[in-house]
């Protein structure tokens, strides 16, 4: 496929990422761009969204989501979620922020991102847009327009807009004429009008037309397939035409090709690549169409997927299209930039179109055409068009073309070709480096900087340092822009400094990683602007990359030395932010300078705790001198210094001073407090109190109290303790506070403390208050009240005659304690008048119950009578009042019975207990009123008051109470029962108590007593003789306890419920009595039921029915006979009753018993009144059983309501096929009719009927029958309808194969491949069948349909069939390159396709296969080995490979390979190559290798070569020794082989005089005068003059050393002359500093004192 004009890629398989196929559809999966795929999933009732990030290696992120739809932003991690159709929320997943949250008025049907910022919505009536990033979270979308009527009843599938968001199109599809039709609503925002268009897809795009310069034309592209004719059409029209443009786009219309078998296919997506001018149109069935945008020419059509596509998005910056099919494959298509132009030239033979495409996109493939056209136009002197052609071709955009066009003179009045060339390029895009430089010079020279700047801003120029150099003389700022774009860092820094934009230097250096000389920059800035210099230095410090490059001490010294204290301080404050110990001297320095020159600054520095490592004693002393006592105290540690400073309270903030004591220990704190009090106690007492209050826990309250007491500071003590008393747990502290408050006469405070405080010792405080005898006794009253010293308090107050405080206590403090006060006063024999007066003053506030208790203890109740009566008159309804009055009336015998009966307010229990010993009857009255059951029963039993008890029980009518008194353990039960029967019952007229009494008797097992009671009530004259309930109860009791009396009771009694009594009789086996009751009350049906079900005599029942002779009884007896399986009798009874209502049971039982003959009359009777399917169905079944087919035909021909499907099924089960056929035919049930025809042997009719049924199960049945009868043509018809269902394939194939019908099976699948519903399983199964039975056809089938088969399944089949070529083909197309390569190695020893093997093996993932392949080639294909190794080199472990061949002694086989990999300079490769060259005695190649590549054991190789027989190798060994500075070894070999030139070079290279002198000596000794002279020349600088003179004198070589001597003399003279000149210059003038060096000033040079650093 390398020559195709498209590149086809599978981006990801969503199912392989865990996405369930059930969610791969248009509603659940959204695809806004080639960045994200979003899938909404539901699992276990929980919604989640899976986000597949295609740009991050298909990373899957899952998030819980409560919504029903979600889409991702095209490029950002922004997700939009929709819930309930109307609620929309948009989140940024990276920042975890909410961008939008709103609720629409109607549900969103479709939504899509229209741009990077705008989201579009389509509802049932409206089209809306929302700017997601406008910052307004709650803003609702804006209404764009209303939906057009042409979108009614459509499914919205797309919403698009142009770049300016002023044209919009909404696309919908619907079913029409059996096809999918498309509708488009085109809307113009500016004109506010909509237009309805037919179409399935739409998109807006731009195109540059020839002659319009760089201004594009807007076009609207639509694709449509006519629902009526099926014809496809692509339309391209211009919108918003600009009349000022010379060229106008002409409307283009092109046919869209659809294959004949794709009748239901339609366009589903369209994308346009503006860069290349290509339209991509994708159809539902996976066909991709390519069109050229300007001409509308169809370029290419192919199918990219066999599965249907449901969504698509732009791909690769909108230069391609991506889509998702139903199997979850994300597929992408874009043009092949290298093949599209050749394809148009070669396949379409359209040269003009090829040039258009190549020109627009700058694509290769038409370079020769451009070159020829360019040359032709030049020859024709058509320079303008030649320039345009050159600008249109990337291959012609070079310096040669520029030079040629520059040298052409334009005709008069015409634009020069070079300017036309540049203008064309600028219209189309960006100039390259050479073009920019060529254009810049003339433009700037003509002073057209604005034009140049315009091009620069539009990014039309490629910037370089050379361009900046050209621009700088004209405009430094413009040059800076060029340098910035070109990355010329040094030039950028220079320009920024020249423009004084210092603040931009550091950010730029950080950005580009450039390091300038900061000291020089800072020095220059200090001179011009100290503030800016300080800011610049601070910025350097704040940058971790530059902070380490500067010396902060030197910089600070520069500031301070020039008296820039503020700037130097600011710098050091930033520099010393770390506050580390090593910065201590600098911290001290900053503080010293500022304490001397700016104390306020020093105060602020110390106050902010910026430093902690300075010299604190020194700074403290300076602070004290400067009057900064606070700072001095913060740094002093000696108590003497602290006490000296701390007394300056007027200069110290009080809050700080108080807090300062927290830094002192207890002893120091006390010393300072004493110093403050000694200095000026009046002025400092407030401070002392605050300190004592804050640090009370630390110093101790006792110590502080003693301190205050020692100085007699009562007021201070009071205020100090006031701060503690509410929080302390110390009793002594509270006591001291009460004492101090008493001295200060703060009685209200004492009152507050004793009232609210819970810590003090009440006994101690009470005694203190009694002894203090305060003017106000209220604190004492409160203490005694709180801690229950009331009695003692009353005694103290009564004795001291403080009666007003007694009244105050009762009236104001605690009226609830009045009872105790009264008791105490009574104990003191206080005057009753005072007591009564006291009580009258607190009327309504006294707890009367307690009061009466206290007074009752002292037998003085009568004293309360006036108080109680006054209380009642005041409306007090307290129960205790009535209790007390009752007791007083009882004791005084003042009409107590009347009071107890008439009054309801008293406590009946309390008063009753009070009366029990005085008068039991009064107690009975009280208990009866209060329904105090237990006490009433007790006193009536104790006092033999049984008749009162009986009356009370009957009146109460409480079953639980009855059960209690009737308990057999009650010794008084008999007397009570007698009283109830003799006295209680005769007095009653209400039946309810009687009934409850009876129930109580029954509950307590009083059987005989109950019957006795009931007989007396009912059988003797009483108001209850005719009571239904009691008569029933009597019968019930008799049934249970005296069954023999039941018959007599039935005769005597009439007023009872027969429906209740008769079932009880049956329950207790009194069946005849039950029959008598029913018969007596004329309940014939129930009487008959007793005969049938209980007495179980059907004959007696039949006689009874005959006697009564009603239809109801006949129906009832018929049902009983049916249940007893007397079927004929039952049917006869039903017929007599003319009752068909029980037809279901009659039919079921009769059919089970086979009584069809008897059943038919019943059914005919039933059909007269009922129209029931079961009746008609049963009649058909009965006729069928009796073989009355004619009657069935007559029945079916007439009116009937039978469920013929169900009846047919029953007949089919009973093998009554003829009758079944009649039923199925009558309802046109082709599925079952086909099955029936199969059993009737009519196969052709069965197939025809199965086609009408179109049911898999039917096709299978008919197919099985046809196969069994060898009706293969009919079987194939059935099979073709089965194989399109993948789940039926296995069973169908097994059926054919088990019968040996292989050819017929293959023929079936071959015929099925052309079906529209052909699926992967069919192609797969046919491939397997070919591999088994017709292997020759396998490869061809695989090559045609490899993309449509299940490759793993076919791999197993071809492997079993030993089809190795096919196996390799499948492995390769399944990307299992490892298996493909291994199969080729194992199975292709002879007929190996070397080129194909190389293509396969380079793609393997397991590199061990490389080495298997190498061994395979060594063994079978050694001549191709080097070519293989060359292909494998990029991933090959070369050392390992070389070792393999070294061990097997096969290095010569890979010599070219070794040469090829030598540049990698690997030691193993080098060693192997050396071995090979030594073996081949190729010294030249060896020399080149050791010179070029140094990674090998050089000394080891030298040692090997030293002993080689050839002198050339020995020379190489010597050179290796020389390279490793083994001079002696090297010279030894060279001297031995007389290689004098190399020896002289070696000695000179050594730079060692000893080596040189040794070789000189050797030359003298061996008489080699030429070598001696040559060495003197080569090593001239290494030889000592004295050594040369000596050896030449001793060996008479003076003439040979003359040149050497002359050179030495000349050097000496030159040196002397030079020294003389330098001395003369120094004596003439002093040496000056050189310009350009950094200014490094020392303290001494600036005449300043040492800074203390």
From Swiss-Prot:
Annotated PROSITE patterns: CHCR (PS50236)
Extra information: Present with 28700 molecules/cell in log phase SD medium.
CHCR repeat extents: 543-689, 692-834, 839-978, 985-1130, 1134-1275, 1280-1426, 1429-1572
Job description of the protein: Clathrin is the major protein of the polyhedral coat of coated pits and vesicles. In yeast, it is involved in the retention of proteins in an intracellular membrane compartment, presumably the trans-Golgi.
Region named Globular terminal domain: 1-483
Residues covered by region (WD40-like repeat 7): 308-336
Region of interest: WD40-like repeat 3: 108-152
Gene responsible for this protein: CHC1
Cross-link (Glycyl lysine isopeptide (Lys-Gly) (interchain with G-Cter in ubiquitin)): 1107
The keyword Chloroplast appears for this protein: no
Record GO cellular component, one term: actin cortical patch
Family indicated by similarity: Belongs to the clathrin heavy chain family.
Region (WD40-like repeat 6), start-end ranges: 264-307
One BP term from GO: endocytosis
GO MF, one annotated term: clathrin light chain binding
Keywords: Coated pit, Cytoplasmic vesicle, Isopeptide bond, Membrane, Repeat, Ubl conjugation
Subcellular location: Cytoplasmic vesicle membrane; Membrane, Coated pit
Region (Binding site for the uncoating ATPase, involved in lattice disassembly): 453-469
Record's comment describing the protein's domains: The C-terminal third of the heavy chains forms the hub of the triskelion. This region contains the trimerization domain and the light-chain binding domain involved in the assembly of the clathrin lattice. The N-terminal seven-bladed beta-propeller is formed by WD40-like repeats, and projects inward from the polyhedral outer clathrin coat. It constitutes a major protein-protein interaction node.
Organism, scientific name: Saccharomyces cerevisiae (strain ATCC 204508 / S288c) (Baker's yeast)
Positions of region (Heavy chain arm): 528-1653
UniProt superkingdom: Eukaryota
Region entry WD40-like repeat 1, spans: 23-66
Protein name as it appears in the record: Clathrin heavy chain
Assembly: Clathrin triskelions, composed of 3 heavy chains and 3 light chains, are the basic subunits of the clathrin coat. Interacts with the auxilin-like clathrin uncoating factor SWA2. Interacts with INP53.
């Amino acid at each position: 496929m390398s020559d195709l004009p498209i590149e086809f890629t599978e981006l990801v398989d969503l199912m392989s990422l865990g996405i369930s196929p059930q969610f791969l559809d248009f509603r659940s999966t959204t695809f806004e761009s080639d960045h994200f795929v979003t899938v909404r999933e539901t699992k276990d009732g929980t919604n989640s969204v899976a986000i597949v990030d295609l740009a991050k290696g298909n990373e899957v992120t899952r998030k819980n989501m409560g919504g029903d739809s979600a889409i991702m932003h095209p490029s950002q991690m922004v997700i939009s979620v929709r819930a309930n159709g109307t609620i929309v929320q948009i989140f940024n997943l990276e920042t975890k922020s909410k961008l939008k949250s709103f609720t629409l008025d109607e549900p969103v049907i479709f939504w899509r991102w229209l741009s990077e910022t705008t989201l579009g919505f389509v509802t049932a009536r409206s089209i809306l847009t929302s700017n997601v990033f406008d910052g307004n979270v709650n803003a609702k979308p804006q209404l764009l327009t209303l939906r057009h009527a042409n979108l009614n009843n459509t499914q919205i599938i797309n919403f698009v807009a142009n770049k300016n968001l002023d044209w919009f199109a909404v696309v919908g599809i619907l079913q029409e004429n059996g096809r999918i039709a498309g509708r488009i609503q085109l809307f113009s925002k500016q004109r506010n009008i909509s237009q309805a268009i037919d179409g399935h897809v739409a998109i807006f795009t731009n195109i540059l037309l020839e002659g319009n310069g760089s201004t594009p034309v807007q076009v609207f592209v639509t694709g449509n397939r006519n629902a009526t004719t099926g014809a496809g059409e692509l339309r391209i029209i211009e919108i918003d035409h600009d009349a000022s443009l010379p060229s106008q786009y002409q409307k283009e219309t092109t046919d869209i090709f659809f294959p004949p078998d794709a009748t239901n296919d339609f366009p589903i997506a369209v994308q346009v690549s503006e860069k290349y001018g290509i339209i991509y149109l994708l159809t539902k069935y996976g066909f991709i169409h390519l069109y050229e945008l300007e001409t509308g020419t169809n370029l290419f059509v192919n199918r990219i997927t066999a599965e249907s596509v449901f969504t698509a998005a732009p791909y690769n910056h909108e230069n391609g299209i991506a889509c998702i099919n139903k199997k979850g494959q994300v597929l992408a298509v874009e043009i092949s930039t290298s093949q599209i132009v050749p394809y148009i030239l070669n396949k379409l033979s359209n040269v003009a179109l090829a040039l258009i495409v190549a020109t627009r996109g700058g694509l290769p493939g038409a370079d020769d055409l451009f070159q020829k056209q360019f040359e032709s136009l030049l020859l024709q002197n058509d320079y303008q068009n030649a320039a345009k052609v050159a600008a249109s071709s990337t291959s012609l955009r070079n310096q040669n073309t520029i030079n040629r066009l520059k040298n052409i003179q334009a005709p008069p009045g015409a634009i020069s070709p070079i300017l036309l060339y540049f203008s064309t390029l600028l219209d189309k895009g960006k100039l390259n480096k050479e073009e920019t430089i060529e254009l810049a010079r003339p433009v700037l020279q003509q002073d057209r900087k604005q034009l140049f700047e315009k091009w620069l801003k539009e990014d039309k120029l490629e910037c370089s340092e050379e361009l900046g150099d050209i621009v700088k003389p004209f405009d430094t700022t413009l040059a800076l822009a060029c340098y910035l774009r070109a990355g010329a860092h040094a030039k950028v820094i220079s320009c920024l400094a020249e423009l004084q934009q210092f603040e931009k230097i550091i950010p730029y250096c950080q950005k580009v990683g450039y390091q300038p000389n900061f000291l020089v920059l800072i020095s220059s800035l200090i001179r011009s602007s100290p503030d800016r210099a300080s800011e610049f230095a601070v910025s350097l410090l704040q940058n971790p990359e530059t902070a380490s490059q500067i010396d902060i001490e030197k910089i600070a010294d520069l500031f301070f030395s020039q008296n820039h204290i503020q700037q130097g301080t600011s710098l050091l404050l930033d520099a010393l932010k770390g506050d580390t110990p090593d910065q201590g001297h600098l911290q001290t320095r900053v503080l010293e300078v500022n304490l001397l020159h700016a104390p306020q600054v020093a105060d602020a520095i110390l106050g902010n705790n910026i430093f902690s490592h300075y010299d604190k004693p020194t700074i403290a002393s300076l602070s004290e001198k400067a009057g900064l006592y606070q700072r001095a105290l913060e740094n002093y540690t000696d108590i003497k210094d602290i006490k000296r400073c701390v007394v300056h309270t007027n200069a110290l903030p009080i809050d700080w001073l108080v807090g300062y004591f927290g830094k002192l220990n207890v002893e120091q704190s006390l010393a300072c407090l004493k110093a403050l009090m000694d200095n000026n106690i009046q002025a400092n007492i407030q401070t002392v109190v605050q300190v004592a209050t804050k640090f009370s826990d630390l110093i101790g309250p006792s110590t502080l109290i003693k301190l205050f007491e020692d100085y007699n500071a009562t007021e201070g003590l009071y205020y100090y303790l006031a701060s503690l008393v509410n929080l302390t747990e110390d009793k002594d502290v509270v006591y001291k506070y009460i004492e101090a408050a008493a001295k200060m006469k703060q009685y209200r405070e004492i009152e507050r403390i004793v009232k609210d405080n819970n810590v003090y010792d009440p006994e101690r405080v009470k005694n203190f208050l009694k002894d203090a005898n305060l003017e106000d006794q209220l604190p004492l009253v409160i203490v005694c009240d709180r801690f229950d010293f009331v009695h003692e308090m009353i005694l103290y107050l009564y004795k001291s005659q403080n009666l007003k405080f007694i009244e105050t206590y009762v009236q104001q403090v605690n009226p609830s304690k009045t009872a105790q006060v009264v008791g105490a006063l009574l104990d003191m024999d206080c005057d009753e008048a005072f007591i009564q007066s006291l009580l009258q003053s607190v009327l309504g506030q006294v707890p009367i119950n307690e009061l009466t208790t206290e007074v009752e203890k002292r037998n003085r109740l009568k004293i309360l009578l006036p108080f109680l009566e006054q209380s009642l008159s005041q409306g007090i309804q307290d129960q205790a009042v009535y209790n007390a009055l009752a007791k007083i009336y009882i004791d005084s015998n003042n009409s107590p019975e009347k009071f107890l009966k008439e009054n309801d307010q008293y406590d009946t229990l309390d008063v009753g207990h009070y009366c029990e010993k005085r008068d039991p009857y009064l107690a009975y009255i009280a208990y009866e009123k209060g329904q105090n059951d237990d006490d009433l029963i007790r006193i009536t039993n104790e006092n033999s008051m049984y008749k009162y008890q009986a009356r009370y029980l009957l009146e109460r009518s409480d079953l639980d109470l009855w059960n209690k008194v009737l308990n057999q353990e009650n010794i008084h039960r008999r007397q009570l029962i007698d009283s109830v029967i003799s006295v209680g019952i005769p007095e009653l007229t209400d039946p309810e108590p009687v009934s409850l009494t009876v129930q109580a008797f029954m509950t307590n097992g009083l059987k005989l007593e109950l019957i006795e009671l009931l007989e007396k009530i009912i059988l003797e004259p009483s108001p209850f003789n005719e009571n239904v309930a009691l008569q029933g109860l009597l019968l019930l009791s008799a049934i249970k306890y005296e069954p023999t009396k039941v018959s007599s009771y039935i005769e005597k009694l009439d007023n009872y419920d027969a429906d209740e009594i008769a079932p009880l009789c049956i329950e207790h086996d009194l069946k005849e009595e039950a029959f008598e009751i029913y018969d007596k009350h004329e309940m014939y049906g129930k009487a008959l039921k007793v005969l049938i079900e209980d007495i179980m005599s059907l004959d007696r029942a039949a006689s009874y029915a005959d006697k009564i002779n009603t239809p109801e009884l006949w129906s009832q007896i018929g049902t009983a006979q049916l249940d007893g399986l007397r079927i004929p009798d039952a049917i006869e009874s039903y017929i007599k009753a003319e009752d068909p209502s029980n037809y279901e049971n009659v039919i079921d039982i009769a059919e089970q018993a086979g009584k069809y003959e008897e059943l038919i009359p019943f059914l005919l009777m039933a059909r007269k009144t009922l129209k029931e399917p079961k009746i008609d169905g049963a009649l058909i079944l009965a006729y069928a059983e009796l073989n009355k087919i004619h009657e069935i035909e007559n029945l079916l021909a007439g009116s009937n309501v039978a469920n013929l499907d169900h009846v047919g099924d029953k007949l089919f089960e009973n093998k009554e096929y003829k009758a079944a056929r009649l039923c199925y035919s009558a309802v046109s049930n082709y599925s079952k009719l086909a099955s029936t025809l199969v059993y009737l042997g009519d196969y052709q009719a069965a197939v025809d009927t199965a086609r009408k049924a179109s049911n898999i199960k039917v096709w299978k049945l008919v197919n099985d029958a046809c196969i069994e009868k060898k009706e293969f043509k009919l079987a194939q018809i059935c099979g073709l309808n089965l194989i399109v269902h993948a789940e039926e394939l296995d069973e169908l194939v097994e059926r054919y194969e088990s019968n040996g019908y292989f050819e017929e099976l293959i023929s079936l699948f071959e015929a099925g491949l052309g079906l529209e519903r052909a699926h992967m399983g069919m192609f797969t199964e046919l491939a397997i069948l070919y591999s088994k039975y017709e292997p020759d056809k396998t490869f061809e089938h695989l090559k045609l349909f490899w993309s449509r088969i299940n490759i793993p399944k076919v791999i197993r089949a071809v492997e079993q069939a030993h089809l190795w070529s096919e196996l390799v083909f499948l492995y390769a197309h399944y990307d299992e390159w490892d298996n493909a390569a291994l199969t080729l190695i194992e199975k292709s020893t002879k007929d190996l396709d070397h080129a194909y093997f190389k293509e396969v093996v380079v793609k393997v993932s397991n590199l061990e296969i490389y080495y298997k392949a190498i061994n395979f080639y060594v063994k079978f294909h050694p001549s191709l080995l080097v070519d293989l190794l060359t292909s494998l080199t990029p991933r090959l472990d070369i050392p390992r490979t070389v070792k393999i061949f070294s061990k097997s002694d096969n290095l010569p086989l890979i010599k070219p390979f070794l040469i090829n990999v030598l540049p990698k300079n690997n030691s193993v490769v080098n060693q192997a190559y050396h071995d090979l060259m030594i073996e081949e005695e190729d010294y030249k190649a060896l020399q080149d290798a050791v010179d070029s590549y140094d990674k090998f054991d050089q000394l080891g190789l030298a040692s090997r070569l030293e002993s080689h027989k050839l002198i050339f190798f020995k020379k190489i060994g010597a050179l290796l020794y020389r390279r490793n500075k083994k001079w002696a070894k090297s010279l030894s070999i060279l001297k031995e082989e007389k290689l004098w030139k190399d020896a002289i070079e070696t000695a000179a290279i050594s730079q060692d005089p000893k080596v040189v002198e040794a070789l000189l000596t050797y030359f003298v000794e061996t008489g080699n005068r030429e070598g001696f002279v040559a060495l003197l020349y080569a090593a001239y600088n290494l030889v000592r003059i004295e050594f040369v003179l000596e050896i030449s004198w001793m060996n008479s070589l003076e003439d040979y050393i003359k040149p050497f001597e002359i050179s030495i003399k000349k050097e000496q003279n030159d040196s002397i002359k030079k020294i003389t000149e330098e001395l003369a210059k120094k004596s003439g003038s002093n040496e000056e500093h050189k310009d350009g060096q950094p200014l490094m000033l020392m303290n001494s040079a600036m005449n300043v004192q040492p800074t203390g650093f």
